[in-house]
Amino acid sequence: LEDLEFALNRGAEIYAEICGFATTNDAYHPIAPAPDGSGAARAIEAALCDGGISPDQIGFINAHAASTPAGDVAEAEAIRLVFGERSGEIPVTSVKGAIGHCMGASGALETVTSVLAMMEQRIPPTRNYRNPDPAIGLDVVHDEPREASFTHLTKHSFGLGGQNACLVIGEAPANRRTSID
């Protein structure tokens, strides 16, 4: 990671740009998120605002989705609060089903996965997603990767004690790679 200006000046090969970032803490409960998703929604909204990106520009969501009933439903509520009617149309995935919950490393691994998905315009599936919860009501990519066309995504990390973080990632402004070496 480096400042975009420095990367451009040195002619670096740029894979993506972190357009916005925000953290919040809803302090709802030591281990459970606010069930209405309000704390997570504030993080997503603040990250979009930080990046000057409209919710309408988001074409993919890499969810925290740790497969906890309370956490997943709260995250779905947060997505509905921020994206409104579009929330059921934006492809959502989580790589935890494929790689497990890597705790402190999860955010970094999921960010790399998000960047690769954007570069390839191909969203990885949520592995081992067998019994959809009707309370989620989102367009969860499962079974097979999905071809997609998007320029911006959100990457969510929501943790114990109501810690909420969101990255807004956009296509590289210059030197965009077209495939992975």
List where the protein language model places each region:
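Condensing-enzyme catalytic core mediating Claisen C-C bond formation in acyl metabolism
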Residues: L1-G51, G59-F60, Y129, A174-D181
